[in-house]
Each structure stands twice: as C-alpha cells, then as structure tokens.
Amino acid sequence: MLEGPTAGGAHAWAPFFHIKNIRKRVYLMAQKFMTYEQQLNKLQADKGLTIPDADFARKTLEEISYYSLIGGYKDLFLHPASKKYKYGVTFDEIVAFYHFDEQLRSLFLKYILQVERHLKSMISYHFTEKYGELQTEYLAPHNFDYIHHSKQVKRLVDSLSKTIAMPSHYRYIAHHARKYHNVPLWVATNAMTMGQTSAFYQYMPNDIQVKVSKAYPQYTEKQLHQFITVIAKCRNVCAHGERLFDFHTTDMIPDTLLHSKLGITRKKGLYQNGKKDLFAVVIALRYLIPNEEFKMFRKNLSLLIKDVLKKCPYLTEDQLLKEMGFPKNWAKIMR
C-alpha cells in the first residue's frame, strides 16, 4: 500500500516520478545522431550556410567533426536573433577560422614554452642552490610553505613523486634513477607540467621566489606568479587543442604600465581588456620573453589576424578583436 501524504502535503513517492520526468526531459533534449549528409543538409537548408563544395565539406567533417568545427566556431558568423548564418557566409569561412585558431594555438604555445623553459631553469637553479641536488629535498614538504598551504604542498610533492617514479617513460629520468639513484631537480623539471611549475614557484620559500623574480625586474615575486598562473591556463588550452581565440580565465595578471599606455578603459576600477583574456597573455609575454622575440611574436600574430579577416569577409576586425579581448590599438604594444 502506498503511503499517504507527508508533511507539507507531498507524497512520499513523488520524488520517484520527479526523477523519472527529469530523465525523460534529458532524453528528449539529447541530440540525435546525424549522417554527414544530414549534417550538411541541416547547415544548408535549416541554418542558411552556403556550401560551395559538398565533397570538401564532407571530408572536413570527417576529419574535424561537426561538433569541433561548427559547435566551436559558428557563433561569430550567426545573426544574434535568428541564430542562422549571415547571408553569404560559406562553410569555407568557418573552416578558415578553425585553422586560424589552430595557428593561433601554435603561435602562443611556441612563446609560452620559452617562458616555461626559462622559469624552470631559474627555479631548479635557485632551489638547488639552497637545498642541494638530492631529490629528497624537493620531495620534502618542509622545504615549501607547508605551514600555510599544507594540502597544496602535499599535492605538489605527491605529483612530483609520480613524475620521477620508476619505471619512467622519460629516458633521462630513467637514466639518472638507475645510474645515480637520484633525479636532481634540473632533470625533473624537464618532465614537470606548467601547472606543477606554477605550483612549485607559488609554494617554494619566499627568498627563492625573490631570486627567481629578479630575472624579471619590473615585477615582484607575487606579480610574477600572477603572470605565470594565467600563462599556465593558456598553455593548457593550446596543448589540448581547445578553442583559444576567446580565451578567458578567472585568474588575472597584475595591472601594468601597458594597460595605461594603451588607454584601456576601466570599469569599477578594473581594466576591461588585458586582465584575464587572451590579450592578458600577450601582455604577459611582452614582459616575460626577450624584446626581439616579442617583436617576432607580435608580427606573426598581426599577420594571422589580417589573413583570417581576408578569408572571412563577413567577419569584421572590430568583432574579432572584441572576442579576443584585444583593444583596437593592440599593435602599439611595443611603443
């Protein structure tokens, strides 16, 4: 026999039907499988996208997938109200924009890796200078700020232990472990992720942070960590092939002289560009890589933007820069 109403007049068995209804709604909302032909027909007939070459379009969907290509890059080409493509937009333009983002990831990753390499070199040098070359030293929680960040330090040390654990697919780690029974930090850093490197810097003693930050004299050790944190997030996006052009993070780089020089607007005291978007990464690179390297980075970035705008005539420069978090005068960053 079913129970009567519970307190408040609800039936005890009502949650069962509630869960069942939720599942039903989820199933109804789930997208159905579509063949490549159906996908192209949907784009053309339902969404108004021009497809000049159906064979090329099908092969592209086979190679990239509908979700990665259309799901990831359609928004810039749609009418905000109708959610249909702007008249004249072609499939080829979306493909061109996809490849633009692909090239963007390669460009940013190239220079982020330079920052990562330099940072790892500075950390391993100054940490080893203080504590010595034994792996037990960087695996010892008390050599970090364990008092204030015990959980985070333990997590870091555990991850470092796994990085140098045997058997290792890193030949250089396996070599040192077998021959010397020790993997010094300057070897281990080569296998460390940017996330591990960022955490290592954050939780190592302040005196070592200060020494490392002297390689970047314009900023304090805390401000350097802000740069590193945002760069690490961007690196992950690049390395995992995620969408980069509209990159955003909850972390922020510090206010810089460049924000002021470029006349970036403020709202409630916060700069509206270059704090936690892709332009923030550009600013970080301006301070963290050599001047000549940054000039080359800026040149190649400018060429990528000009090239994609030529290939995507229905995409305006203002629209693209806004999505990227770039001010209109972003190229004056060197002046």
Where are these regions (language model features)?
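Extended intrinsically disordered or low-complexity regions, especially N/C-terminal cytosolic tails and loops
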Residues: 1-233, 245-335
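Acidic/aromatic/glycine-rich contiguous surface patches that form carbohydrate-binding/processing clefts
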Residues: 241
